[in-house]
């Protein structure tokens, strides 16, 4: 066994896998999943374990384009979302969650994903640090979001304009009525983008996800994930 001083003198060897190289996507995740790859649109995209409800690939494609249209046209003036804006999703897993995330991706809007166990103070840091404009919240977490807005000095009226209840089968409508908010259903069924926002060439380096660390040893750290990195993941 050579000692460490001789390692640098040893010839280098490159080992090449026998598995062919993958052709990596050079587009957005939305385009890769719904335009480039070929899958039966009737197949399930997501299944809700607790209820057995299914969201098919066709459903998800249709609803995400409707969502992308809705955030441009149905949100209050001054809070509508366009390419390059940032929105927050504050919700545990549900069938509404993929509609929101893929809807934001289709519209070219950056998504920052908040831990559904956050307190209002923890949520306030991520909301302000990410520069999110609108929060899509699970019905049960609406009080946390409203408390967060109060903490950072946003008026009750403006808070209601920046908050959308994210629910598709549960008590979203009831919560929306109680607090005077829009809900997911208000954004759907009014039209759809004719196509998703495209990310090609240098545009594939644009940020589409802002994920945050747990903040165990200090404030959570934001991590930017660009369009092309998202599209790489399903390739593997």
For each feature predicted by the language model, list its residue ranges:
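Conserved AMP-binding A3 loop
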Residues: 54-58, 199, 208-232
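Conserved S/T- and glycine-rich ATP-binding loop of Class I adenylate-forming
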Residues: 87, 104, 135, 207, ...
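Short hydrophobic alpha-helical segments of the AMP-binding
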Residues: 97-105, 111, 230
């Amino acid at each position: 066994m050579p000692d460490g001083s001789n390692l640098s003198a040893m010839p280098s060897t490159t080992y090449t896998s026998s598995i062919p190289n993958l052709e990596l996507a050079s587009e957005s995740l939305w385009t890769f999943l719904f335009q480039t790859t070929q899958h039966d649109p009737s197949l399930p995209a997501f299944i809700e374990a607790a209820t057995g409800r299914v969201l098919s690939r066709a459903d998800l494609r249709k609803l995400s384009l409707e969502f992308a249209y809705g955030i441009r046209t149905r949100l209050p003036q001054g809070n509508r979302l366009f390419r390059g804006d940032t929105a927050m999703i504050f919700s545990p897993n549900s069938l509404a969650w993929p509609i929101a995330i893929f809807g934001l991706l289709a519209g070219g809007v950056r998504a920052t994903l908040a831990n559904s166990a956050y307190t209002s103070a923890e949520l306030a840091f991520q909301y302000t640090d990410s520069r999110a404009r609108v929060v899509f919240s699970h019905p049960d977490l609406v009080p946390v979001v409203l408390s967060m807005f109060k903490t950072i000095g946003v008026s009750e009226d403006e808070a209601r304009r920046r908050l959308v209840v994210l629910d598709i089968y549960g008590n979203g409508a009831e919560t929306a009525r109680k607090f005077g908010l829009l809900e997911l259903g208000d954004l759907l069924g009014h039209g759809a983008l004719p196509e998703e926002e495209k990310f090609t060439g240098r545009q594939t380096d644009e940020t589409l996800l802002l994920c945050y660390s747990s903040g165990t040893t200090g404030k959570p750290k934001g991590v930017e994930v660009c369009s092309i990195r998202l599209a790489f993941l399903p390739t593997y």
